């Protein structure tokens, strides 16, 4: 049930001054250390940071994880201990125990407050110990926890080699994607190369699980587009070659800092495309890449229609229902666009931070989707005030609220269906084939309450509860 609204003619952006109810960006360690297999992440912070990492990722004593806490003590903060000597001692221990290809220093709020010059210490120390060091300020001063990955990738973009630095066979062997597609058979190299159209090199950026990377790479290969590399690569030693004039495209909405670094520092050309989330977004993403590279896309309309047909059983559950985004991980606009295309309405999209330049193509596709589906445009609220949001939720009574973990239980107590937004962060939601996983997550609370009602367990479903949040 939704309150009738007058349809706005263009996207409306509001900005409130609410608190950021989100995880700390140092949580990016939890997926990046698994993605970059030869890395070691050293988080430099306080006991609070350590407690958070333990809660977020588990202790994992026997697994020997490739991340650790460098706990700041009173001597560090009062400048009685030398930062360089302490970090050198820890990095030498990491080199001796794990021997990684790269050490990533993750700065925190405390390193910012005490003005610890990690960027200045790293070049001197990496020359002394012989291991590259990447520094990233993934602190709680950011807007959303997913921006921790953005900071790390922006720092890593500086470390990508140029073609002049990579000679001979090393250049060919760096690219893990190329090796995957050729299966290591040198004899088939010419045949594989003939499947691609001659175009400017393309590098994709964004950390995705290996099956999704393979999937998107193969989707582009069907159009004759060759992916020169991914940032981050599976191994640090396989970072993509990036030269001036290369094309780059992002796969996630929260990577605006990485995009800016690639454009300004590495002189790359950014392909401003919608993000490959949902069949509609994936098709638009591929079409935009093809158009920039001068390639005529083939069969995408049929491919998209085939995926939509396979999703019909889920779409029937949400068609005509409303969804409200409170804002948490910067994926809100892409998810809202996909759910609107599935037949839902979305009165409001809360988002911690909006880079309108980087998300321009996604916002344009959102407008087009609303127009095609004949539904009102959502109101986009940047830095939403949670108290005001809850009042709006009470007035609108949406069928589903996608929210951070802090607000899920209070809203459920009010009889409102909720879904944790963090689940979309860790699920495989990119590409044509993973659209079903998005709908599986989005419809789960609706299906759960429907099934409880059918079983006669209505007392487990809170309805029309007058209590205050």
UniProtKB/Swiss-Prot annotation:
Disulfide bonds: none
One GO term of the biological process aspect: light-independent chlorophyll biosynthetic process
Keywords: 4Fe-4S, ATP-binding, Chlorophyll biosynthesis, Iron, Iron-sulfur, Metal-binding, Nucleotide-binding, Oxidoreductase, Photosynthesis
Pfam families: Oxidored_nitro
Binding site for [4Fe-4S] cluster: 24, 49, 109
Cofactor: [4Fe-4S] cluster
Record flagged with keyword Manganese: no
Catalytic activity entry: chlorophyllide a + oxidized 2[4Fe-4S]-[ferredoxin] + 2 ADP + 2 phosphate = protochlorophyllide a + reduced 2[4Fe-4S]-[ferredoxin] + 2 ATP + 2 H2O
CDD domains in alphabetical order: Pchlide_reductase_N (cd01979)
E.C. number: 1.3.7.7
A GO molecular function held by the record: oxidoreductase activity, acting on the CH-CH group of donors, iron-sulfur protein as acceptor
Keyword rRNA-binding listed: no
Family statement: Belongs to the BchN/ChlN family.
Main function: Component of the dark-operative protochlorophyllide reductase (DPOR) that uses Mg-ATP and reduced ferredoxin to reduce ring D of protochlorophyllide (Pchlide) to form chlorophyllide a (Chlide). This reaction is light-independent. The NB-protein (ChlN-ChlB) is the catalytic component of the complex.
HAMAP family: ChlN_BchN
Subunit structure: Protochlorophyllide reductase is composed of three subunits; ChlL, ChlN and ChlB. Forms a heterotetramer of two ChlB and two ChlN subunits.
Protein name as annotated: Light-independent protochlorophyllide reductase subunit N
Organism of origin: Synechocystis sp. (strain ATCC 27184 / PCC 6803 / Kazusa)
Taxon lineage: Bacteria, Bacillati, Cyanobacteriota, Cyanophyceae, Synechococcales
């Amino acid at each position: 049930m939704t309150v009738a609204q007058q349809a706005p003619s263009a996207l409306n952006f509001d900005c409130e001054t609410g608190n950021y109810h989100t995880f700390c960006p140092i949580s990016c360690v939890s997926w990046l250390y698994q993605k970059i297999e030869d890395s070691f992440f050293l988080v430099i912070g306080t006991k609070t940071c350590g407690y958070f990492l333990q809660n977020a990722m588990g202790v994992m004593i026997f697994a020997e994880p490739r991340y650790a806490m460098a706990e700041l003590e009173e001597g560090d903060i009062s400048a009685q201990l030398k930062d360089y000597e302490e970090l050198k001692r820890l990095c030498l221990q990491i080199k001796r125990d794990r021997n990684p290809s790269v050490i990533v220093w993750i700065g925190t709020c405390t390193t910012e407050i005490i003005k610890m010059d990690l960027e200045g210490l790293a070049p001197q120390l990496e020359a002394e110990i012989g291991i590259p060091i990447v520094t990233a300020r993934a602190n709680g001063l950011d807007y959303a926890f997913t921006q921790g990955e953005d900071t790390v990738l922006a720092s890593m973009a500086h470390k990508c080699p140029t073609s002049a630095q990579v000679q001979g066979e090393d250049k060919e062997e760096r690219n893990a994607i190329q090796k995957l597609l050729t299966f290591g058979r040198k004899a088939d190299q010419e045949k594989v190369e003939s499947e691609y159209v001659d175009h400017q090199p393309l590098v994709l950026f964004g950390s995705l699980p290996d099956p999704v990377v393979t999937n998107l790479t193969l989707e582009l290969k069907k159009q004759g587009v060759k992916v020169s590399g991914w940032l981050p690569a599976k191994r640090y030693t396989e970072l993509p070659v990036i030269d001036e004039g290369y094309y780059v495209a992002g796969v996630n909405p929260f990577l605006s800092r990485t995009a800016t670094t690639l454009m300004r520092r590495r002189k790359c050309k950014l392909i401003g495309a919608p993000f490959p989330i949902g069949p509609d977004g994936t098709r638009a993403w591929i079409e935009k890449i093809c158009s920039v590279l001068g390639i005529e896309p083939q069969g995408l309309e049929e491919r998209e229609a085939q995926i939509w047909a396979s999703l019909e059983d889920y779409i029937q559950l949400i068609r005509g229902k409303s969804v409200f985004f409170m804002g948490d991980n910067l994926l809100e606009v892409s998810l809202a666009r996909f759910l609107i295309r599935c037949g839902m309405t979305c009165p409001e999209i809360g988002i911690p931070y909006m880079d309108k330049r980087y998300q321009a193509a996604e916002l344009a596709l959102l407008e087009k989707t609303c127009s095609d589906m004949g539904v009102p445009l959502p109101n986009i609220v940047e830095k939403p005030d949670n108290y005001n949001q809850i009042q709006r939720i009470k007035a609108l009574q949406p069928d589903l609220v996608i929210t951070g973990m802090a607000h899920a239980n209070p809203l459920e107590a009010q009889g409102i269906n909720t879904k944790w937004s963090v689940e979309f962060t860790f699920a495989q939601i990119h590409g044509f084939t993973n659209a079903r996983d998005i709908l599986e997550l989005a419809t789960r609370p609706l299906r759960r309450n429907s099934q409880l009602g059918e079983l006669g367990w209505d007392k487990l479903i809170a309805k029309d509860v007058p209590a205050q949040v």
